[in-house]
């Protein structure tokens, strides 16, 4: 089963122009869904993504990518 990344295009913290290519690099076969994730509170302060329906958040995009990579290794 392919991994799924969900990211928000409304929140202020995630920069989709840089985040999506980095997610594709982590897992080229993953499904990436873009749209509101109803995670507005944290999404204003931290960059985040949902990885296989689990939220992952960090203060920077680099930290987020590291956390997502760890999450994928556990799978």
Curated annotation (Swiss-Prot):
Annotated source species: Geobacillus kaustophilus (strain HTA426)
* UniProt protein name: UPF0741 protein GK3412
Question: HAMAP family of this UniProt entry?
Answer: UPF0741
Q: Which family does it belong to?
A: Belongs to the UPF0741 family.
What InterPro entries does the annotation carry? DUF1450, UPF0741
Q: Where is the signal peptide?
A: none
Q: A Pfam family for this UniProt protein?
A: DUF1450
């Amino acid at each position: 089963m392919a991994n799924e990344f969900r990211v928000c295009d409304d929140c202020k913290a995630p920069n989709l122009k840089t985040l999506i290519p980095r997610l594709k690099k982590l897992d080229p076969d993953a499904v990436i869904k873009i749209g509101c994730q109803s995670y507005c509170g944290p999404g204003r302060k931290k960059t985040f993504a949902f990885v296989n329906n689990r939220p992952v958040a960090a203060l920077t995009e680099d930290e987020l990518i590291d956390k997502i990579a760890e999450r994928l290794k556990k799978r």
